[in-house]
Each structure stands twice: as C-alpha cells, then as structure tokens.
C-alpha cells in the first residue's frame, strides 16, 4: 500500500468472522451510490444501492437502537436484478431516545382513562417533515423496541409465524393538523403479527450461513429486512444524540389516537431461530408522506373522524330509545299484569331486558317472526268476540300514532321526525288490519322492511315496540280486552327477539 493509499480513512461493518471496509469518502451506505464506485463489491455481484459484502448481502445501511428512529433507503435506480433486502445492524439500547419519555406520558394519562373510550390513546415522539417524493427511492423510517417493552407475552409463548400476538403498545404513525407524527399508542386490546427470521446464506461459502445475520419480512411488498445482530448484546460506549433528517424529536401530549393511524406503517415482532441466542424484536416501519399524500391523508382523517362522530351519535341514540322502550314495556307489563298476573309481568320484564340490551343485534327474519305469531294465533284459548274486536280497532283509530312517532324521533339527534311519524302510523294501520282480518303478515313485514332499507335493528325494534306499548297504555279498554291486546303485543314484539317468548305465552299465560 502506498503512502497515499495508507492515508485514506476507512469505515466498515463486522459480519462475524468477516470485516468489510470501504473508503469513507467513496460512498456512504444507503446514500447515492453510483455503479462502479469505490466499494467492497464482490466480483460476482451486480452493483447496487449499498454494494455487497463478499458473502453476497448488501452492506449495512444503518444501525438500529431501540427507540431511535433511523432512515433506511433503497435506491431502485441503482439496483439490478432481485432486491437483496434492506440491511441494518441491530445494537443494544442507546440513551437519548424519545420513546421512553412518550411511554411515560402515555402510562400516566392512561391512569386517568382513555380520551375516547373506544379508541387508543397516543403520545407522539417525533414529527415528520414531508418526503421529497423521489419515486426512485423507497424510504422507510424504522424504530425498534425490545419484546418486553411492547407485550407481557414471553418469547417462549409467541405464536407461530403469521399469527398475531397481543401487545400493550405499538409505535405507529398518525395525522394531526396536516402533519405526520410517530407515536406510541395503547390503552385498548391490540395485536401485532409474528414473523420468523431466517439465516442468510453465505454466497462465498456455499452451504453455510453468515454468522449472526438473518432476514425477515417487516413490510408487505418490499424486500426482507437483513439484520446483523452480532452487536445486540454489546454495550454502547458513547451516548451521542442521533437525529435523522426530516425527523424532529419531540414528546407530544396525551391525546386520542388518529382515525387513520397506522395507514402508512407496518409493525411486526421478529422471532429469531431457536438456539440463536437472539431475543425477539418489535420493529415498526413507517412510510414518510410527501405533501400531496399528506393532504390526502388529512382529508381521509377528517372524513373518518366525521364518520366516527356520526356513528357514535347513532349508537347513543339507539341506546336512548332502547332504554325508553324497555321502560314502556315494563309499564305495559304492570298494566296487563293486573289482569293476567305476575307471570305476564315477569315475561314483560324479560322482554324489556332483551330490548334494553339489543344494541348491535339483529331482529329475527319475517319468516321466523311469522312462524312464532302463527303459533300464538293458533292457540284456541286466544279468542275475542266481535264487540271487543271493534273496541280494539276503534281505540287504534283514535290513537295519535304520528305524534308518538314525532316524540320517538325527538329522542335522537340522528332521527328525522317525518320518517318516524309515517312509520308509526303504518304500525297503527297494519295493526288495525291484523285485528280486523287476522292477517298479521303486513304488520310484521313492515318492520322487516325498515331493516332492509337500512334502519338499525335496534331502532326498528324500539319504534315497533314503543308504538305498540304506548298505544296499549293509552287505550281505555276493559280488563279482558287489555289482557288480549297485551298477549298480542308481547307475542309480536317477542317474535322479533326469540321464539321462546311465544312459547311462554302459549304454555304459561294464556288460559
């Protein structure tokens, strides 16, 4: 080596029993490399974005420390043939990382409850500047955590690859006011897939693997990540601040996680082969968005937030009407029970309890409901004379169903009064038809039509039950007639919930 050659500083990476070095001014791993430049390129390997070691893998682009964001770049313009994979060296924990500080804020916040009970809480630890949008470069920010930092599941109990493992925390991206952030989230049940790392073959020595080097898929449709893990258990001697371009480290506030969280990141738990002595790693890979993508993501965030708000209001409205309806059915039970006894009161309370807990459930089909109603009407003990039948019809005709529909609609912010007034009046008219002709099909079909047209089953059951129950309470009929109508109402409502209610009416109440 000449004096000039000896004066050239070098950099390198240790792949176990092989050290690959390169001139520090010739290129930087992961940077803009030109084919044919200075490198440790093996003669049999094509030029590429990071060049290759003699064993046939790309030289390490970056060093991953738990909790510290690193930028990994794949330059497609320089890569020839199949991608060999992202290549990183994994080290032991290094200080000056921001995830721990964000986790502390998150844990303190969770002690006081979630900002929104149905969604995870989040604390950001980095703000991301927009990407340049270079289509020839695939860029991912990667950040790792040790297994015990994200889950209580020990390494020995991790499921097979392809299955998910429950985690307490995830590192993900989210949107706030047009800006992309990296954040730690938690507070609700979450899962992350498990992937298996496999040894990387040594191309310079066929039939052998490179010591302490593995590959694993961490992001769909992208090359596997090549991990050099020989330094994982070696303490870091210095503790400088690491700052990537476009990544501004800062600890945010305790907030509700975004509605499009994780839209541009993938996270996995990487398990290494048994006997490797390497502990599993949690890795999150995040795509940095350019300005146009940021605008689209923020629009999607706003739309998702609006959809969530509307859904939340609808759920609150459903719960309100279910509660109100169950109260009315209990009142019906008390009134009719004065004639039919405690068994009817108990049945009414059971129906009311089912109604109160009907949110998220589906009413029985028209055919099933009609099967139950027909069993009830076939009971020879359920008879009424013409005079009493006329009294029931007249009572229904006098009932202001439209007013009842308006009052029902007033219970919910998302209900339209006109729609419910019409539907309540339809219940009135088809109930009259049922009493006059004995044909209850139109009444039951009316309710099913609401659900088919998009009404939630909980709302449909509530409107149907509330209309029938309110009418009975308003009727000024004799005790005998009230008992008959009470059985019909309990049977009609119960038929949409469970066939057992008609069976109880037939065998325990009708005499």
UniProtKB/Swiss-Prot annotation:
Signal peptide: none annotated. This colicin is a channel-forming colicin. This class of transmembrane toxins depolarize the cytoplasmic membrane, leading to dissipation of cellular energy. Colicins are polypeptide toxins produced by and active against E.coli and closely related bacteria. A motif (TonB box) lies at residues 17-24. This colicin requires TonB for its uptake. Pfam families: Cloacin, Colicin. The chain crosses the membrane at residues 455-475, 477-497. This is Colicin-B. Keywords: Antibiotic, Antimicrobial, Bacteriocin, Cell membrane, Membrane, Plasmid, TonB box, Transmembrane, Transmembrane helix. Belongs to the channel forming colicin family. The gene is cba. GO terms for biological process: defense response to Gram-negative bacterium; killing of cells of another organism. It comes from the Bacteria. It is a multi-pass membrane protein. It is found in: Cell membrane. GO terms for cellular component: plasma membrane. GO terms for molecular function: pore-forming activity.
């Amino acid at each position: 080596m000449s004096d000039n050659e000896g004066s050239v500083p070098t950099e390198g990476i240790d792949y176990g029993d092989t050290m690959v070095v390169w001139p520090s001014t010739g290129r930087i791993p992961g940077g803009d490399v030109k084919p044919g430049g200075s490198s440790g390129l093996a003669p049999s390997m094509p030029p590429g974005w990071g060049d290759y070691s003699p064993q046939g893998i790309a030289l390490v682009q970056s060093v991953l420390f738990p909790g510290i964001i690193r930028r990994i770049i794949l330059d497609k313009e320089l890569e020839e043939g199949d991608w060999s994979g992202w290549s990183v060296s994994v080290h032991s924990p290094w200080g000056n990382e921001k995830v721990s500080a964000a986790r502390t804020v998150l844990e303190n916040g969770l002690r006081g409850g979630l900002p929104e009970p149905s969604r995870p809480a989040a604390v950001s630890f980095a703000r991301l500047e927009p990407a340049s949008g270079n289509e020839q470069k695939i860029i991912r920010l990667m950040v790792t955590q040790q297994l015990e930092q994200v889950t209580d599941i020990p390494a020995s109990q991790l499921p097979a690859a392809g299955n998910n493992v429950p985690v307490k925390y995830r590192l993900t991206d989210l949107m706030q006011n047009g800006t992309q952030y990296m954040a730690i989230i938690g507070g609700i049940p979450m899962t992350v897939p498990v992937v298996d790392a496999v040894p990387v073959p040594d191309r310079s020595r066929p039939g052998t693997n490179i010591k302490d080097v593995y590959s694993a898929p961490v992001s769909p449709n992208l090359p596997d990540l090549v991990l050099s893990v020989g330094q994982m258990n070696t303490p870091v001697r210095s503790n400088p601040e690491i700052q990537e371009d476009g990544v501004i480290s800062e600890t945010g506030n305790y907030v509700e996680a975004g509605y499009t969280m994780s839209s541009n990141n993938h996270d996995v738990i990487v398990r290494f082969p048994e006997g490797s002595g390497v502990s599993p790693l949690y890795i999150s890979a995040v795509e940095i968005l350019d300005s146009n993508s940021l605008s689209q993501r923020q629009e999607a965030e706003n739309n998702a937030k609006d959809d969530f708000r509307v859904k939340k209001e609808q759920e609150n409205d459903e719960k309100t009407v279910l509660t109100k309806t169950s109260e009315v059915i209990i009142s019906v039970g008390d009134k009719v029970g004065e004639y039919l006894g405690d068994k009817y009161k108990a049945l009414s309370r059971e129906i009311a309890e089912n109604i109160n807990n009907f949110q998220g459930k589906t009413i029985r089909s028209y055919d099933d409901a009609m099967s139950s109603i027909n069993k009830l009407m076939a009971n020879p003990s359920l008879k009424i004379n013409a005079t009493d039948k006329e009294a029931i019809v007249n009572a229904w005709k006098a009932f202001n169903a439209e007013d009842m529909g308006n009052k029902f609609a007033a219970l919910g912010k998302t209900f339209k009064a006109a729609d419910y007034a019409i539907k309540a009046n339809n219940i009135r008219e088809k109930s009259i038809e049922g009493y006059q002709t004995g044909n209850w099909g139109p009444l039951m079909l009316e309710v099913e039509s609401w659900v088919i047209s998009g009404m939630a089953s909980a709302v449909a059951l509530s409107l149907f039950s509330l209309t029938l129950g309110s009418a009975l309470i308003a009727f000024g009929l004799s005790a005998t007639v009230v008992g008959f109508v009470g059985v019909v109402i309990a049977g009609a409502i119960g038929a949409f919930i469970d066939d057992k209610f008609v069976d109880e009416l037939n065998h325990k109440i009708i005499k």
